[in-house]
Amino acid sequence: MKRSTVLGSLWMVVVVSVLGHQPVMDMAPRWAGGYGVQLFQVHSIADDLRHGESMLPNPQGLESRVDTTWLEGVYTFRREFRITAKVPYVDKSRQWLRDGEIIRQTGHGLGDIIIGAPIKKYVNKKGYTYNLSLTPNLRLPTGSTDDDWAVGDGSWDAGLSLSYSFETPKWYHLYDLYYWKNGSGRNFDHGDELAFDANIGWHAWHDGDNGRGLFLMLDIAARHIEPGKNQMVDPAGDTIAVGPVAMYYHEDWMLKFEYRQVVYDKAETMRFGDHRRFAVGFGLTF
């Protein structure tokens, strides 16, 4: 089988923005010695205030913006085992109230690098294939804590993911459950996180002769974050976000666009809500 044809089917797996802690390319390439890189730009904004399930008045126009550029990579030792890495650069700002006064906080620089080691079990059947994956992760304290709104918290964090994916020539499903245990930071702590992601994809178009095609997906992301310590704005609470994903691939490269909107939000304390997330990514496999 031509390598371009193989890549055409692999991009069905690459498309998913799964496991908020792993590269979108964590499952490809599948051949021993293969590797891939991706540049992923994420823009998140929020301008509503929440407490519990209620939206609060925001007469001061408080708002939050986070822009993160991810350099993501994967190396496949053998089909069942690979190493992944995510290196973020963060630029963010927010307005908040302190003692009744509006303050502006900013932060920028290298964020916390994430290393993962997916272990996979593939099963091929007539007309479909599926795989199970167990992925330990380590988040390194590489992000600075010096800015007004720190890009890191100085802690070593451990994560574990269990996922299941299923694909046919026309459909792709992925379900992922993961947990982050956050360590003690410098002066403040982030709360632990439990999350579930579901990706449902449709292979809308495929040109096998030229190794190109288009995927359309629905992305669903549910999060539960425990309260942290000494944070001016604690993200603790429960959220569910949904949105579309579109990805075009051509042989060894792919271009991806996604949008995600929070549809359910329950905040432990007053914080920003109604988050909107826009992202674009470009990836290559070798």
Where are these regions (language model features)?
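Short loop/turn motifs that connect adjacent beta-strands in outer-membrane beta-barrel proteins
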Residues: 25-33, 80, 123-131, 169-170, ...
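Outer-membrane pore/translocation modules
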Residues: 91-191, 249
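Surface-exposed strand-loop-strand hairpins of Gram-negative outer-membrane beta-barrel proteins
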Residues: 43-68, 148-149
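Residues on the lipid-exposed face of transmembrane beta-strands in outer-membrane beta-barrel proteins
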Residues: 39, 71-75, 85, 115-121, ...
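Residues that define the transmembrane beta-barrel architecture of outer-membrane proteins
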Residues: 33, 65-69, 108-113, 130, ...
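Outer membrane beta-barrel transmembrane domains
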Residues: 50-52, 59, 190, 194-286
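Transmembrane beta-barrel strands of outer-membrane/channel proteins
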Residues: 37-43, 85-89, 134-140, 175-179, ...
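Outer-membrane beta-barrel biogenesis signature
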Residues: 17-54, 125
